[in-house]
Amino acid sequence: MISNLKIHHLGFVVKDIDNYLKNSFIKKIENRIYDPAQKAELVLIKSINDFYFELIQPKSDDSYTYNFLKNHEGGYHHTCYIIKSDKEINCYLNEKNLKQFLGPMPAILFNNKLVSFCINKNKEIIEFLHDY
């Protein structure tokens, strides 16, 4: 049986990061980069208790998140959980019947730690940050 996982961040797709930040209460950005693998600009914002928000701005029509922005005009996109081992991720994939569709791949926003993306039965995108 699996236990509760620690949520690392919630990801939001936005049309324009600068415009989004200008209209929000966010004051401190932890990290801002362009990720060539995702073809997107990414911003990591630290909240309390090591909880983060990620803003994702697709930069081309072949970005992973471009269709999401086009179809939904942005908004909540995914939840990222921290995992501590390959055994742990395999347990979650099997027990929750998750379908992995991307990764593991290095994530420049997280100092090239590996990330994997899955979808669950609720059609929610789940990201796993491999913290080992």
Question: How would you name each of these model-derived features?
Answer:
Residues 16-18, 51, 61, 85-87, ...:
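Residues that cap or initiate secondary-structure elements
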Residues 56-64, 76:
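Short, conserved turn/kink motifs that form compact alpha/beta structural patches or helix kinks used as
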